[in-house]
Amino acid sequence: MLHILGSAAALKATLLSFGPWTPLVYFLLQTAQVVIAPIPGGVTTVIGGALFGWYKGFLLSGSAAMLGSFLAFGLGRKLGRPFVMRFRDRKWVARLEALEEDKLDRFLFFLFLCPGFPDDFICLASGVTKITFRRFVWICTIGRLPGFFLIALIGAGIMKNDPVQLAL
């Protein structure tokens, strides 16, 4: 199983082997990768764009990642600080918790906009802050979806060998 997750080509081939179930399996994988994070989300999003085209790839990867983000937030909220601190040092989590609400909103939004930042963990850690679930949903959705759009577009460009999409 790990060899499949470690190779984009193997992952793509495995997904395609599910035939008409490929979109559902992809959706579940993308959701799970946010919550349990065995592979970077950028890899699965590129594969989604390559498999399904930029539009369907964006819809599948973005909606699955949002669901995973909300589940990770819920896990952080339900299981609390001791659980979250298993994945990051105590000081980092304490700093996040100490941010005032307006600063926390801006900080989370900025982190979600930064490509390559471990925003899956941010979703988990946000569960131990004072932010409400509703507010988290808005910030996460607005902050994360642009990145999923661009990465799905790149994945679709790879399949079409489109230099404009690849240049993005």
Each language-model region and where it sits:
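Transmembrane helix boundary and interhelical junction motifs in multipass membrane proteins
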Residues: 30-56, 115-123, 144-148
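Transmembrane alpha-helix boundary and packing residues in multipass membrane permease domains
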Residues: 45-46, 73, 124, 140, ...
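Membrane-interfacial helix-loop-helix
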Residues: 1-28, 55, 61-121, 128-134, ...
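Alpha-helical transmembrane segments of multi-pass membrane proteins
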Residues: 33, 64, 68, 139-143
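Hydrophobic alpha-helical transmembrane segments and immediately flanking/interface helices
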Residues: 125-145
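Structural signal for membrane-spanning alpha-helices in multi-pass inner-membrane proteins
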Residues: 33-37, 72, 111-112, 151, ...
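C-terminal membrane module of polytopic membrane proteins
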Residues: 140-168
